[in-house]
Amino acid sequence: MKIYTFDFDEIDIQEDFYREFIRAFDLERGSVNNLDMLWDVVTGDRLPLPLEIEFTHLPEKLRRRFGALILLFDEAEEELEGQLRFNVRQ
């Protein structure tokens, strides 16, 4: 299972995450620019499943800012039944 790591020392706002996500998965520019589009990509057939997504350098005080992203990946992990693993590390 390949691990894709997103370093929140380098990600300040949600738009930065979308840009890094597009780059990491070699998606078409502009294919993810909001949570709905991200959900469609993650739960659709556009990612090389199975995979693990890891958020690093995301302390508790920043988790509120990125709470919607965390919730989306938590829900996608359930939806994809073992094909996606998601972890958050400080």
Where does each model-flagged region fall?
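N-terminal intrinsically disordered, low-complexity segments enriched in P/E/S/T
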Residues: 1-30, 43-90
